[in-house]
Regions:
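Active-site alpha-helical segments that house and flank conserved acidic catalytic motifs
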Residues: 7-25
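Long, compositionally biased intrinsically disordered regulatory segments in eukaryotic proteins
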Residues: 69, 99, 106, 124-127, ...
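Histidine/acidic-rich helix-loop-helix segments that form or flank divalent-metal centers
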Residues: 53-94, 105-110
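Short, function-defining helix-loop hinge/capping sites that tune catalysis or transport
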Residues: 23-27, 87-90
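Divalent-cation-assisted or electrostatically stabilized phosphate/pyrophosphate-binding catalytic cores
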Residues: 29-46, 73-75, 97-116
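Short, small-residue-biased leader/transition segments that mark boundaries at the very start
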Residues: 1-5
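Conserved catalytic core of Hanks-type protein kinase domains
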Residues: 11, 16, 50-53, 79
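Charged phosphate-binding loop/patch that engages nucleotide di/tri-phosphates or the phosphate backbone
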Residues: 117-142
């Protein structure tokens, strides 16, 4: 793999490690999102604080780049990060979407930044969303 792909994979992994430690927040849990940033910041400091200083700085920089979504690499990494739960819901007939009464507006809101990372991936994502709306797995309206 090229350096760009390695960097993107590291961004996703480093972000996920922090989410695991902080307690992942369900994508459509507005109440959980209120404390998400603080929990993730504390987890990041705790986990990366265990590392030698040079690794800590490198990993924190990659984490911050991922969070900022300003570089092409971080935008694509975010698109990939958003893809996993979409694929999971698609493969289980919208199990979580149905259980939480998720609307098309919510799913499109979450996936809106996918286009910034990859137009092709967004087109595919849109087709998956439309298929799940038609199947009744995602509510058309709230």
């Amino acid at each position: 793999l090229g350096d760009v792909y390695k960097r993107q994979m590291l961004m996703c992994l480093l972000h996920d490690v922090v989410e695991i430690d902080a307690g992942d927040t369900y994508a459509y849990d507005e109440k959980g999102k209120e404390t998400q940033k603080a929990r993730e910041e504390a987890a990041k400091e705790r986990i990366y604080g265990l590392l030698p200083e040079d690794q800590k700085e490198c990993f924190q920089q990659l984490f911050e780049e991922f969070e900022a979504r300003e570089t092409a690499e971080s935008k694509f990494a975010h698109a990939m990060d958003n893809l996993q739960p979409l694929l999971l819901n698609d493969s289980n007939n919208g199990g979580d979407w149905k259980a939480h009464r998720v609307t098309a507006e919510q799913v499109y809101g979450r996936q809106s930044q996918t286009k910034d990372g990859s137009e092709v991936l967004f087109e595919w994502t849109d087709a998956v969303i439309q298929k799940n709306i038609a199947a009744g797995n995602i509510q058309k309206e709230s």
